[in-house]
Amino acid sequence: MARQQGWFALLIALVISAFLLCINLPFQLGLDLRGGSQLTLEVQALNPNEQIKSEQLEAVQSVLDRRVNGLGVAESSLRTIGTNQLILELPGEQEPSKAARVLGKTALLEFRKQKINTKSEMQRLQRIRSQVNNIDLYKKASKDNKSELIENKKIGEQVNDLRVALGLANSSLNEHDQIDQIRQKVNSEIVELFEPSSLTGSDLVSAGRRQEQNLTSWEVTLAFNQDGGEKFASLTKSIAGSDRLLGIILDGESISEASVGEQFKVAGITGGSATISGNFTAESARELEVQLRGGSLPLPVSIVQVRTIGPTLGVDNIRRSLIAALLGLSLVAIFMVSFYRLAGFIAIFALSFYALFNIAIYALIPVTLTLPGVAGFVLSIGMAVDANVLIFERVKDELRRGNTLIRSIETGFSQAFSSIIDGHITTLISCISLFYLGTGFVKGFAATLGIGVFISLFTALSCTRVLLRFFMSYKSLRKTTNFLSENQLPKQLT
C-alpha cells in the first residue's frame, strides 16, 4: 500500500510540474493559428541558362535568416522549397511590405570616389534630384482640391522641364511614373560619375544607427574589418581636400555623397569606421542597418507572392482545433468507460496526463504549433488509447481464465508490452522519415506525432499501471465486476 502511494505521489508531482510549465512558458503558434504574413521568394540565377546550385540557395537562405532575425519578428521561419524558392513565415506580422523592402534588396554596398573633372555635371544632377524630391514634398503637402489642382499644374510643368534637362523623349506615362523614370535616370547618371572600388559591404563587421544631432533625421554607422579600414583610409586620403566626392552606392543607387576634408590628406579617415547620413527616417535607417548586418545576397531575390492571414482567422482556427480535440477526447472517454468500466475511468485520467505532458513538452522545446501539428497531436491520442485497449483486453482475457484481479493486471501489462512497443516503433520510424524528408507543415505534423509516440509509451506503460495499482490497493475497488460484466465472468467467479 505504501509503495503504491509513493509511486502515485511521484506521478502527481510530475503532473504538477507539467502544469506549471504550461502556465509559465509561452506557446509558439504558427501562421495558421496566430495570423501573420507568408512571403514566397524566388532566387534568380545570374545567367538565365544556369541552374541554381544547392550551396547557392543555402547561402541566400543564410543571408535572409540574418535579415529576418534583425527585423525582430519572433518565431519566424524560413525554409527552402524546390530548387529556387524560399518560404518565409512571419507570425503576427500584418504589414509584410516592411519585410519585403528589407528582404528583396541585394544590399550590395560600395564606396567609390568621384571621377576627375566631373564637378559641374555632379552639381547639375544633384540639383535635378533635389527638384524631384521637392516635387514629392509638394504632392504630399497638397491638402485641399483647389491647391492640389494648382500644384499639379506646376508639377506637370516641372516634370516637362526635367525631362528636357535629362534628354528624355516625350512620354505617355502618367505623372507618377514619369517622376520615377526621371529619378532612375538621375540616379544612374550620378552613379556613372564614380569610379569602381574594391571597398564593399563584405569589408564590414557591423552596422548600427543613431539619431543625428539635429534630432530630425537618422544616420547609419559602419565598422570595417582591418582590411576594410585600410581600404577606407586609402580611399579617403586620395580625395581629401579636393572637389571629388565619396559616393556610397547601395544596389546601384547613390544613397549619399560626401566631401572629405583637407585634414585627412596625410592618412585619410582612420579608425575603421564611417557614417552614412542621407536624411534617413528611423524606419529607413533600421532597414539599411538590417540589410548591412545580414550581408549582401549572392544572387538576386524577388518576392513572387505575399499572403496575409488575419488574427481573427487564426483565433477561429484555434477555436475549431480545440472543439475537434475536445470532441475526440469526449468520444474516446465514452467508449473507454462503456467497454472497460473502472479501467476506462483510469484510462481517461492517464489520457489527461498524456495531453498535459504533451503540451508541456511543446512549450519546453519549444514546438511551433500549426494546424497539421494539432492533427498530429489528435492522432497520437488515438495511439495512446490503442495502447490502453491492448492492455485492458489482455487483463480481461486473464480474468476470464479465472485469475485474480491483481494477477490479471500484471499479466495483462506483460503480454501487451511487446505489441505496444512494436506499434510505437513503426509509427516512430514513419515520423522520422516525414520529419527529415518532408517540408514545412509536414514536419510540424511529424514532430507532434513523434513526441506523442514517446509520451504515449510512458503514459501507457507507466502512468496507467501506477494508477491501476494505486486504485486496486483499496479493497472496495478491487472487484472483478469493475472490469467485466457478470455475464462475461467465468462460472467459478459468478
From Swiss-Prot:
Top-level taxon: Bacteria
Cell compartment(s), UniProt: Cell inner membrane
Transmembrane portions of the chain: 7-27, 322-342, 345-365, 372-392, 420-440, 441-461
Keywords: Cell inner membrane, Cell membrane, Membrane, Protein transport, Translocation, Transmembrane, Transmembrane helix, Transport
GO CC annotation: plasma membrane
Protein topology in the membrane: Multi-pass membrane protein
SUPFAM superfamilies given in the database record: Multidrug efflux transporter AcrB transmembrane domain
A GO MF label: protein-transporting ATPase activity
Matches recorded under PANTHER family: PROTEIN TRANSLOCASE SUBUNIT SECD (PTHR30081:SF1), PROTEIN-EXPORT MEMBRANE PROTEIN SEC (PTHR30081)
Description of how the protein assembles with itself and partners: Forms a complex with SecF. Part of the essential Sec protein translocation apparatus which comprises SecA, SecYEG and auxiliary proteins SecDF. Other proteins may also be involved.
Name of this protein: Protein translocase subunit SecD
Organism: Prochlorococcus marinus (strain SARG / CCMP1375 / SS120)
Record gene name: secD
